[in-house]
Amino acid sequence: MKYVDTNIILRVILRDNEELSPLAREILKTNECYVLPEVIPEAVYVLNKVYGFNRQDIAHAILQLLPLVVVKDVRLTRLALNYFSELNFDYVDCILLARNKLYGHQVATLDKKLEKAIATLPPVSLY
């Protein structure tokens, strides 16, 4: 078992380094690799702010990567990425929204737009 950092995720998605990108992909293919919940928001941020990826491309790239790694709550991650690609919220707000819709967790916020999304988006079935 290996925990992978954001650099591994980025090298696999970006394929921007002749030496490191294939190495990163090989690490994912030949090991049971875990991604901590904190790594995905960092990858989302870097892909958007540093590399200029749009929301849909970010969500698609990370969703394509998920079968290669173990994520603690993959269902939550998938839903948050889907919200991120479809709604105009920061990724962390999408995680909060996904927690509310999947598990009924209450969210305290001063963000009226997020509050409205919590009130109007339907819950997601766990089954």
Feature annotation, model-predicted:
Residues 1, 97, 101-127:
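Acidic, PIN/NYN-like endoribonuclease modules and their adjacent C-terminal/linker elements
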Residues 1-35, 50-57, 127:
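Short, well-structured N-terminal submotif of metal-dependent ribonuclease cores
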Residues 8-9, 39, 76, 95-96, ...:
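Alpha-helix capping/helix-boundary segments
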Residues 11-13, 46, 117-118:
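Residues that scaffold the ATP/ADP-binding catalytic core of kinase and kinase-like folds
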Residues 24-31, 62-66, 100-101, 118:
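Alpha-helix C-terminal capping segments
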Residues 46-68, 75:
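Active-site-proximal, substrate-binding regions of enzyme catalytic domains
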Residues 70-110:
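Active-site neighborhoods of divalent-metal-dependent phosphate/nucleic-acid chemistry enzymes
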